[in-house]
């Protein structure tokens, strides 16, 4: 798997593509977590189930790095770090054109499509 950017005995960091889901949902689409479990099972020739804990998620339309725990102990420790705000997350936006301002706030509404389990930005009335 060429999307892995970091792996040790405790953690694995993977590049998530836009459109993928991190964990299973009602759509039935194959989640990234299952792909990583399969990779670990094959790489380490593990019999039975493979533990993989989701430390955080990214929304379906978002691409970026997702961190998974390979052990329950590392999952617990990472959850504690996130809970206590010891981890800093940074988001970057890719835009078609250069924004007019360096900083700003976007105010819009989200409309949920229950069937697709997706949300879309809608115009304010």
Annotate each predicted stretch with a short phrase.
Residues 1-125:
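RNA pseudouridine synthases
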């Amino acid at each position: 798997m060429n999307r892995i950017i970091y792996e040790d005995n405790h953690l694995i960091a993977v590049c998530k593509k836009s459109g993928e889901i991190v964990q299973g949902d009602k759509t039935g689409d194959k989640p990234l977590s299952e792909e990583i479990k399969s990779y670990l099972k094959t790489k380490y020739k593990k019999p039975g189930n493979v533990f993989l804990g989701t430390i955080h998620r990214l929304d379906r339309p978002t691409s970026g790095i997702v961190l998974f725990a390979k052990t329950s102990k590392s999952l617990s420790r990472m959850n504690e770090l996130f809970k206590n705000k010891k981890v800093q997350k940074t988001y970057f936006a890719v835009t078609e054109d250069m924004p007019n301002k360096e900083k700003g706030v976007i105010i819009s509404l989200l409309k949920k499509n229950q069937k697709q389990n997706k949300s879309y930005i809608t115009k304010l009335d």
